[in-house]
């Protein structure tokens, strides 16, 4: 049976081999001019978790588990700090029970058990959080993680309205495989796609692969059905509405504190068969940023409009030696994309970009929409492969003292230059102070008419055993800089426990009080994911 790794991104079969760990040590040793010895990864046999403090009632016993490996998988997400703690077998506060309800009635029963007993109930989708979004809280006599993997079906497809009724526990690949025979797709591909779920996307306001226009899951939701301790919350299925504050907008981004999302009607579309892409190089990152702004303000809406800094261009798209690379991509189920890519390239060239006509890739393969997708070409294809493989590569660096993480934000165009300078300086200063040096890179993951969503990556060589403290100091410096420069603490990674201090600065106090009032009605005993977004 294939099991999820309790420490690495992916399944146990995806954990790095001894040779891969050795090669990572050699590569980092050469990069930082030090000598590192590879550390063998932990195994499930080394787990020794605190014994469960609670026992499920007999009516729920057949959907509950308390085995160490299962509880370890449901303790941490997949951020740097999560990976290091799990690699070191550091599990001081695991959930006591993992419940896997098979229907809404069992979800209700689990929540009733938790509410009546005072146990924390933690919704769990795919476990890919990088912000401690489902990490068990302290101060509870028991913690029950509610894993929705059994609710993983596309229940209904409305091909006239191009929408589908989908259960919240469906993983990205399973969702697409169920839509594909009908010629449809949802076209929402976060980097966590392989190990994340629809309910998790909605609860965390996930950002997908569309770099412009429909960037977030918000744009694809027709209605949401959510089970709360107080009852069922279901919004009316509508293409749009002006009837007061939206129930959907309260559920979207609620991060599991108001209820468990069991179903949603989602907008879907025909599978694209026409594609066009281009990789345009620029003398400076600033020039590339200006081109991206002009492209999106022209309202061409490329599906891909990502700007990579030199380090990222070399690593992710095989374009070494170029200061900046703007990846452009268009797609459609019905319309050839030649004119759109040519228009975008003209804008990019006028802004100082360089690309030969031969490097503009156009694919007008109009085969059956139930078949697999046509391949991407050139720099865009190389970037896509690197994007999907990146989480796996981080597994190889665990246990070597290497400190690395990503941080994302969004800011208006007028504030972008100052935020860029401020955050880069804060990160580099912290790396110099904490690690004795390191590198900072940036890319745009999403671009709006009024501003970009920059994504910063930092890395440096830390001290083995002190990585978490070093990481925390760097993270705080950069987060403080983001807030001071007018950015958001997160564009698409969510708030979780990790971003809570800065989220408290960002949102109005009266909004927090209002959210508390909503929670007091839906979750009167305060058992759902306590500590996220607001204090209980």
Which residue ranges define each predicted feature?
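C-terminal substrate-recognition/cap domain of FAD-linked oxidoreductases
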Residues: 24, 37-41, 62-86, 270, ...
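FAD-binding subdomain of flavoenzyme oxidoreductases
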Residues: 152-306, 527
